[in-house]
UniProtKB/Swiss-Prot annotation:
Native species: Xenopus laevis
Lineage of the organism: Eukaryota, Metazoa, Chordata, Craniata, Vertebrata
Misc. remarks from the entry: The serine-rich portion of vitellogenin encodes phosvitin (or two phosvettes). It is assumed to be phosphorylated to a level of about 80%.
Region described as Disordered: 953-974, 1095-1320
Name of the protein in its database record: Vitellogenin-A2
Domain Vitellogenin: 24-664
């Protein structure tokens, strides 16, 4: 019963809404008032906005069933451009009049159940007006469900079919229904929008979860009331908000707000008169895009005569770039592009005919044509190319940009396809290449609009690839693959697989570069079908038969597909397996995973997490490999407040067989919250570069030894040599992921180019033309213009007008050049380009280069009739004019340039950014307005304002409301109250005067932004910003005629020292070096006789002054301590006595009671006072201190380490009674400070404490007096505390010095006072004037030539000593006027672990000084580098600046992630410690006078590889020998060295082989395995002396034997004995072979053959190949390819199972019986019984084993592992004589005996 009642109630409730759908009267005209407002700007008041307002009456009457007429009456349009809400709307009469004719025409629409159907409008009504109708009818769209009050649905509207929520409220008393409807435009099933310019961009879907650039929503409120005829819509109010922000949303956003009101006025009798014309169906409510797609939002132009307008703009552009670029030139160029878009084919032909022969106009027109992108423009470009009216370069550039800018429609696509097939395009390879690549891009853009790419679109590219493959044209194959990569369509995968190894048998025969191009072609396809591409790439990556470079490229492409965790783990598993056989691939994979795992970009978070997990599978020691192995380096950043980031990546692919990288790829990628793009990518491939760099054309195949070596290798087991390499250099460039150009240069092209440059220019047309243009001078102007960016996103507003977000950027580069060249001697008829390097060249030139970049971003309404919105303009203008005369003499290594002085002010760089509110309408273009968004008002600075009472402020607010009364405060006021804000204004001006050059360099900065409204980055960017870098002439005493800069290097550098010669007379003439040295010493004030005396006196005076200050501070400290003790009488007597006893016993216990590090903590300072036993010492005289120093220094010099101990004890005793020691120690070097005994460091702590302020002293005395501890308890506390020492308090231990440096190290690590003095003294002795023994290497002179002949300027003289063990450089900068000012720089590498530098300046370089030291060592247990800088004296301005900057250092360090503690560190000193905690992280400690900060595990952008040892798979400690050994280490790592000593062999890759060689048989130690076979080195044990080795070297025409006989060295060359008396020996023929005596043996070098050095002394052997032989050797010494894990490669390329098996594989059979080698390789049968599948079997070795010859028995044997293949026992196997390999699979491995020495019954020769 209850159910029946409930059902009846529900039925009754539903019946109440049976007729609530809105209807219109069938007999009357319904009249409504309609008002629509669109405002663009910022939500805060007081800022400018721009918008439009439409007022009208709307009449609706019935036409037929479910069909109504709509007519607009009395339309009125108003514009708003001003400060909101103060300024009023202004009536736009002309625009109203222009639109009234169309707006007042009736329209018909279908309407049923509250839903709007199709709309019918007259054909002559524009789409803009039709969309305004849609905006009105959109208010009538309402869907009412009878049984629900709250419901969601996807509803049709102007913006598409989007998610909508309804809430219905009924007012039964008033018979009204209120409906609230909200629409989310971010959640649409079918959204109406249009995006232009991002066809090639990658949209970031995951970023929308973090931030949305555009967000939009609308809300509607309906008031419905029941009438006799039904429910009537009484009022509809709508409000739409579009929020736009390029940054994070929390930083604010610009808004576009649409408000609509449709209010019922009443009804009137009658019906609307049906129109006489037929109405056209314009579709449903959805917005229809019209001509606004071709209308730029930054211009509004009438284009009735585009040809004439284009001519006018062209003339304007050309005239504006005659001398310099005018500010409006980029905007004019965009106007030209807009006019070309409006031009038809005939207009374009007329323009070309008019300007084709006028160079500057022609260039400008050709710059704009491809940017237009219309069908007519592309068609016209095709005609120009077909008619051959363009040069090859013009045609290639035009095609490249035209196809990328053309709208991807059907007609444009068809024209592009026809253009590619045009015979004139195919005629020129450059044009054809550009056309094919651009066509691939067009296919990509065209097919992105379709569900699948049609076959006919890809057919030209597929046919090109197939035809090129059939003909074997590798360059065309590469071109087709690159174009298919640009297209990026999955339909091309099968075509590309034909060129991928593992998918096609023919692909394995293709060059590696073709295979890698095929892999790279899959990268863009992966964006469409990542799963399929991942499958293909993973197969290639896992295939061991594929070349390593191709596998690395597959790995690169795989990670670009952003695989999941499963795929990443599979990749890591493969890399882990390959780490034993292919270190290049393993290193590349590991470094790529490591780099990705550290990425901070949110787009890559899932991939970074997957890589982090997968790295656990790999061996971390792979990160320890050096840069000889393939690497991936990545640096990225992402700022969430900007919602933008960037990543720079470099992929370095090395090869085991080459010295140089075979491929380098660098790319820069940008990330935004909307898209991500590869802005630029550059790839360079090099193959066989070593062959080309050798610069020789030696026919090694013609040498007799080449044939001999070829015969020998045939006897090796299945020998496989290296494939030949054809020298080739290729490169490509990509923009936004699309390849736009590539080139290939083979050896022939490069050699022909070099030959052409060295031959007479008359033989080569191109060289002759270039030289003629250069020598005859260049006069002209060059200008290029680009529209570098066009991005547009258009969405409809609820009003029916298009809202657009756009970004445009245009750039103009201009250069006016006027040059004249003179060459001495005058070029003759046989003059070549290379002779310019031996001539004297004078260049007189005047250039005026300038660049102007204009960026415009807009947000607002953009229609063909009117525009309104916000516009951001950013301009960067650089203008660098120069007039000069340059002299170049390469023979004398002299360069000089002269330029006149600056006569007028010149703005070098100008940057301006402005934000406007703009309105324009087509009916009245002159009324266009631009208003600054942040008004320029005269508001006072907030600091100068006065407090005012409330009454006045309220009055002002009332007046503001009255001014905006027209807006209707109830309907449209944005805020309840309006406040006035002063704009945020900042300015900065600074000028620097360069008096010597007579110029001022000024910087002017000014910003006027909206940060006072909301202090975020977005509001800081809104407003006006100006930056100017200006150069102005400065007043000087005498007029400057010209400025000169001269650089001279080499032997004639000394003759240019102006202080030594009279410029007018003897400049440039050679001078005696002694005179040069003496004169320069006098100029610099270097007088050896007075130097030590002056410095000693200066030191003593400073020391006395320090002692006086120190004594006064110590007395004050003692008095203060007594006061504190008397004030704290409550302390226990035991505490007092124990404190005093601690003080009295401090001298005896100082060595066991070191002070702890200082701390800002109160309690830590108290404990530190307890542990410092030296704080109450009394001082002694400074004279005693000085005597101790001198005595200690003398002892150190005489006795070395012995003197060290004596000086330490002496100085310790001295320091216990002298306060000056602590003063001295504060200025000691950083290296001694942390390594000296604890008691000396305690002196430093006391010194730092006594220099603290008075308030700090009181705190410390309180802590001291209130503590009680004995010296023993102090030591005990220290022992407990030292186990918890802070990281930054660890000691830096310098690297142990070699024997030669121990003496200096002992001095530096002695006591503090001795260390200070001896260090300074040592540095004075080391800083010898290099001019005493070396001429200057470089002289740089800058001078101003004045009309009064007064010298003015500077000169720098550089000396360098790099031949000695201590490399040193000295530079002196002198004022060439009569002043004594100079600056002196001295840098020296003291030892392999330490370098020092000093900079002194002032009068004779004696006023100011800065010292620096860099040294390596250990910080804790980590290898570290410490840099110390101290400044004994610096200018006062520097001090004041340092104090100001120092206040911000703690905060800045905190913001950068550093942690720290306030500590009293050494004054006037900064220390930086970089400790390597892993190859990719380091710990940083920075100590400045008042602060210690540190950063743990700071990530390095690239790994710092430490030593990798072949025998240990662990991280090796780096030597950090960076100062002297780095070049040698690099060369050693590249070159490699093979060593043989007794039975120990060390290969090129550093693998030790502890195996004896078989007796009496030659083994191939090393040979050239390239097809050239230039050399072979053989070795065997000596017959006569088993401890010695015999060496045989075959190369060129020489067969060289080296051996020991009767304990004497013997050598034969081509069987002719050469005694030691005839050494050194050098061949007369080329290539050269040289043999010279070295120690007890000889050294052979033949660099042209690939032998850098071969050293032999009978017992040991060392062989070092040349660099270019990297990876080209084989033999027992290995391949020299750094692949240590597969070092045991046998001649057939397989890897041996053990070392002995490996050595035996390289043994050579005897060529004759006299050699005594009785071993040979033989297949053996396994003796023991083997059963397979339960049946007996006999097994044979797959590979031969070394056995004695027939008739000989083994004397020595070893066990070797070999593989066996088994056969059934009843199967016979015939092994022919001499067969050395069984072509069967290996069933198992077993150890068998191999013979290494044999005994024969009869001599083989006798047989």
């Amino acid at each position: 019963m209850k159910g029946i009642v409930l059902a009846l109630l529900l039925a009754l409730a539903g019946s109440e809404r049976t007729h609530i759908e809105p209807v219109f009267s069938e007999s009357k005209i319904s009249v409504y008032n309609y008002e629509a407002v669109i405002l663009n700007g910022f939500p805060e008041s007081g800022l400018s906005r721009a918008g439009i307002k439409i007022n009208c009456k709307v009449e609706i009457s019935a036409y037929a069933q479910r069909s109504y007429f709509l007519k607009i009456q009395s339309p009125e349009i108003k514009e708003y451009n001003g400060v909101w809400p103060k300024d009023p709307f202004t009536r736009s009469s002309k625009l109203t009049q222009a639109l009234a004719e169309q707006l007042t025409k009736p329209a018909r629409f279908e309407y049923s159940n509250g839903r709007v159907g199709d709309i019918f409008v007259a054909d002559d009504v524009s789409d803009t007006v039709a969309n305004i109708y849609r905006g009105i009818l959109n208010l009538l769209q309402v869907t009412i469900k009878k049984s629900q009050d709250v419901y969601d649905l996807q509803e049709s509207s102007v913006g598409g079919i989007c998610h909508t929520r309804y809430v219905i409220q009924e007012d039964k008393r008033g018979d009204q229904i209120r409906i609230i409807k909200s629409t989310d435009f971010n959640n649409c099933q079918d959204k109406v929008s249009k995006t232009i310019g991002l066809e090639l961009a990658e949209f970031c879907h995951s970023c929308k979860q973090l931030n949305r650039v555009i967000q939009g929503a609308a809300t509607y409120t309906y008031k419905l009331k029941g009438r006799d005829q039904g429910t009537v819509i009484m009022e509809v109010t709508a409000r739409q908000v579009l929020q736009v922000t390029p940054f994070a949303e929390r930083h604010g956003a610009a808004t576009m707000e649409s408000r609509q009101v449709l209010a019922w006025v009443g009804s009137k009798s009658g019906q609307l008169t049906p129109p006489q014309i037929q109405l056209k169906n314009r579709g449903n409510l959805h917005y229809q895009f019209a001509s606004e797609l071709h209308q730029m939002p930054i211009h509004l132009m009438k284009t009735k005569s585009p040809e004439a307008q284009a001519v006018e703009v062209l003339q304007h552009l050309v005239q504006d770039t005659q001398q310099h670029i005018r500010e409006d030139a980029p905007a004019k160029f965009l106007q030209l592009v807009q006019l070309l878009r409006a031009s038809n084919f005939e207009n374009l032909q007329a323009l070309w005919k008019q300007f084709a022969q006028r160079t500057q106009y022609r260039r400008c027109l050709l710059d704009a044509l491809p940017m237009a992108g219309t069908v007519d423009c592309l068609k016209f470009i095709k005609q120009l190319i077909h008619n051959e009216e363009l040069t090859t370069q013009e045609a290639a550039v035009l095609i490249t940009f035209a196809m990328r800018s053309a709208r991807p429609g059907q007609r444009n696509f068809q024209i592009s396809a026809d253009l590619v097939q045009d015979s004139k395009v195919q005629k020129y390879s450059t044009v054809h290449k550009a056309a094919i690549l651009a066509y691939g891009t067009m296919v990509r853009r065209y097919c992105d609009q379709l569900s699948s790419c049609p076959e006919h679109a890809l057919e030209p590219l597929h046919e090109l690839a197939a035809e090129a493959a059939n003909k074997g044209h590798y360059e065309d194959i590469a071109l087709a693959l690159k174009a298919l990569g640009n297209a990026g369509q999955p339909e091309s995968i099968k075509r590309i697989q034909k060129f991928l190894p593992g998918f096609s048998s023919s692909a394995d025969q293709l060059p590696v570069r073709i295979q890698t191009d095929a892999v790279m072609a899959l990268r863009n396809i992966a964006k469409e079908d990542p799963r399929k591409v991942q499958e293909i790439l993973l197969q290639i990556f896992m295939d061991r038969d594929v070349r390593t470079e191709v596998r690395m490229m597959a790995c690169l492409a795989l990670f670009e597909t952003r695989p999941g965790l499963a795929t990443v783990t599979a990749i890591a598993n493969v890399a882990a397996r390959e780490s034993k056989t292919n270190l290049q691939l393993a290193s590349f994979t590991f470094s790529q995973m490591k780099a990705l795992s550290k990425s901070s970009v949110p787009h890559l978070e899932p991939l970074a997490a997957a890589c982090s997990v997968a790295l656990k599978i790999l061996n971390p020691s792979l990160d320890n490999l050096g840069y000889r192995y393939s690497k991936v380096m990545r640096v990225d950043t992402f700022k969430y407040n900007l919602m933008a980031g960037a990543a720079a990546k470099v992929f370095i692919m090395n090869s085991a067989n080459t010295m140089f990288p075979v491929f380098i790829l660098a790319k820069f990628r940008e990330y935004t919250s909307l898209v991500e793009n590869d802005d630029i990518e550059i790839g360079i491939r090099g193959e066989g570069i070593e062959e080309f760099l050798r610069k020789q054309n030696i026919q090694f195949a013609n040498f007799p030894m080449r044939k001999k070596i070829s015969q020998i290798v045939k006897s090796l087991l299945g020998f496989k040599g290296l494939p030949s390499q054809v020298p080739l250099i290729s490169g490509y460039i990509k923009l936004f992921g699309q390849e736009i150009a590539f080139t290939e240069l083979n050896k022939e092209v490069i050699q022909n180019t070099i030959q052409a440059l060295n031959q007479p220019a008359e033989r080569h047309t191109m060289i002759r033309n270039v030289l003629n243009k250069l020598l005859n001078g260049v006069v002209g102007q060059y200008a290029r213009r680009w529209m570098t960016w066009e991005y547009r996103h258009i969405i409809p507003t609820t009003v029916g007008l298009p809202a657009e977000l756009s970004l445009y950027q245009s750039a103009i580069v201009h250069a006016a050049v006027n040059s004249d060249v003179k060459v001495k001697p005058t070029p003759s008829g046989d003059f070549s380009a290379a002779q310019l390097l031996e001539s004297q060249i004078q260049l007189n030139g005047e250039v005026k280069p300038s660049v102007l970049v204009h960026t415009v971003a807009t947000m607002g309404i953009n229609s063909p009739l009117f525009q309104a919105g916000i516009e951001f303009h950013g301009k960067v203008h650089a203008h660098l004019p120069a007039k000069f005369t340059a002299f170049l003499d390469m023979k004398d290594r002299n360069f000089k340039i002269e330029t006149p002085p600056f006569q007028q002010e010149n703005h070098l760089v100008e940057i301006r950014a402005q934000t406007f509110a703009f309105t324009r309408n087509i009916a009245d273009l002159d009324s266009a307005r631009k208003t600054l968004v942040v008004p320029r008002n005269n508001e006072q600075n907030i600091l100068k304002k006065h407090f005012e009472t409330t009454g006045r402020t309220s009055a002002e607010g009332a007046s503001m409301m009255e001014d905006s009364s027209e807006m209707g405060p109830k309907k449209y006021s944005a805020e309840p109250g309006h406040h006035q804000y002063a704009p945020n204004i900042n300015s900065y001006d600074a000028c620097t005067k360069f008096s010597k050059a007579g110029v001022h360099l000024c910087i002017q900065c000014k910003t006027h932004n909206a940060a006072s409204r909301r202090n975020t980055i977005f509001y800081q960017a809104v407003g006006e910003h100006d930056f100017k870098l200006t150069m102005k002439p400065a007043h000087t005493e005498g007029a400057i005629e010209k400025l000169q800069l001269e650089i001279t290097a080499g032997p004639k550098a000394a003759s240019k020292i102006m202080g030594l010669v009279e410029v007018e007379g003897t400049e440039g003439e050679p001078m005696d070096e002694t005179a040069v040295t003496k004169r320069l010493k006098m100029i610099l004030g270097i007088d050896e006789s007075r130097k030590d005396t002056n410095e000693t006196a200066l030191y003593r005076s400073k020391q006395k002054k320090k002692n006086k200050i120190h004594n006064r501070r110590l007395d004050a400290e003692v008095v203060e301590a007594r006061k504190q003790q008397s004030s704290l009488s409550s302390s226990s007597s035991s505490s007092s006595s124990s404190s005093s006893s601690s003080s009295s016993s401090s001298s005896s216990s100082s060595s066991s009671s070191p002070s702890s590090s200082s701390s800002s903590s109160y309690s830590k300072r108290s404990k530190r006072r307890e542990h410092n036993p030296h704080h109450q010492r009394e001082s002694s005289s400074s004279s005693s201190q000085e005597q101790n120093k001198k005595r200690n220094l003398q002892e150190n010099r005489k006795h070395g380490q012995k003197g060290m101990s004596s000086s330490s004890s002496s100085s310790s005793s001295s320091s216990s009674s002298s306060s000056s020691s602590s003063s001295s120690s504060s200025s000691s070097s950083s290296s001694s400070e942390e390594n000296r005994p604890h008691k000396n460091r305690q002196h430093d702590n006391k010194q730092a404490k006594m220099q603290s302020n008075q308030h700090q002293q009181k705190k410390n005395k309180f802590s001291e007096s209130s503590s009680s501890s004995s010296s023993s308890s102090s030591s005990e506390m220290w022992n407990k505390k030292k186990h918890h020492r802070n990281f930054y308090d660890l000691n830096f231990r310098r690297t142990a010095r070699t024997k030669g440096t121990e003496h200096r190290g002992s001095r530096l690590s002695s006591s503090s006072e001795s260390s200070s003095s001896s260090s300074e003294s040592a540095y004075r002795h080391k800083a010898k004037f290099l001019g005493d023994k070396e001429p200057p290497v470089l002289v740089v002179t800058f001078k101003a030539v004045r009309n009064d002949n007064t010298k003015q300027g500077y000169q720098m003289v550089v000396y360098q000593e790099y031949h000695s063990s201590k490399q040193q450089i000295q530079a002196y900068v002198m004022d060439i006027s009569k002043t004594r000012w100079a600056a002196c720089f001295d840098a020296v590498v003291v030892n392999p672990h330490e370098a020092q530098a000093s900079l002194k300046w002032g009068q004779n370089c004696q006023d100011y000084k800065i010292n620096m030291k860099a040294e390596t060592g250990n910080f804790g247990n980590q290898p570290a580098l410490r840099v110390t800088a101290n400044w004994p004296k610096i200018p006062s301005k520097w001090k004041s600046t340092g104090k100001v900057v120092g206040e911000y250092v703690p905060g800045a360090m905190y913001m950068m992630g550093f942690q720290g503690e306030y500590k009293r560190n050494s004054q006037r000193q900064v220390k930086l410690v970089f400790a390597l905690s892993s190859p990719r992280t380091c710990d940083v400690v920075i100590r400045i006078p008042r602060l210690t900060v540190y950063y743990r595990a700071l990530r390095l952008p690239v790994p710092i590889p430490v030593g990798h040892h072949a025998k240990e798979n662990v991280l090796q400690t780096p030597t950090w020998n960076i100062f002297a050994e780095a070049p040698k280490l690099i060369m050693d790592s590249i070159q490699g060295e093979c060593k043989v000593a007794q039975d120990q062999i060390t290969t090129f890759n550093g693998v030790d082989l502890a195996s004896a060689l078989p007796e009496n048989c030659y083994n191939v130690l090393a040979q050239d395995c390239s097809p050239e076979m230039k050399f072979m080195v053989l070795m065997r044990n000596s017959k006569e002396s088993p401890n010695h080795k015999d060496i045989n070297v075959k190369l060129g025409e020489y067969d060289i034997d080296m051996y020991y006989s009767a304990d004497a060295f013997k050598m034969k060359i081509n069987n002719l004995e050469v005694s030691e008396e005839h050494l050194p020996y050098k061949s007369f023929n080329y290539p050269t072979v040289e043999i010279k005596k070295k120690g007890n043996g000889v050294s052979l070098s033949a660099s042209e053959y690939g032998i850098d050095s071969l050293d032999y002394d009978g017992l040991t052997f060392k062989f070092r190949p040349t660099i270019w032989m990297k990876g080209k050797t084989c033999g027992i010494c290995g391949h020299n390819d750094d692949e240590s894990e597969k070092e045991l490669q046998m001649p057939d390329g397989s890897v041996a199972k053990d070392q002995m098996r490996f050595i035996h594989s390289w043994i050579l059979p005897a060529e004759s019986c006299s050699e005594g080698c009785n071993l040979k390789h033989t297949l053996v049968k396994l003796e023991k019984a083997i059963a397979t599948d339960g049946a007996k079997a006999k097994c044979y070795s797959v590979q031969p084993v070394l056995r004695c010859a027939k008739g000989c028995s083994p004397v020595k044997t070893v066990e070797v592992s070999t593989g066996f293949h088994c056969l059934p026992s009843d199967v016979s196997l015939d092994l022919p004589e001499g067969q050395i390999r069984l072509e069967k699979s290996e069933d198992f491995s077993e150890k068998v005996e191999a013979h290494t020495a044999c005994s024969c019954e009869t001599s083989p020769c006798a047989a």
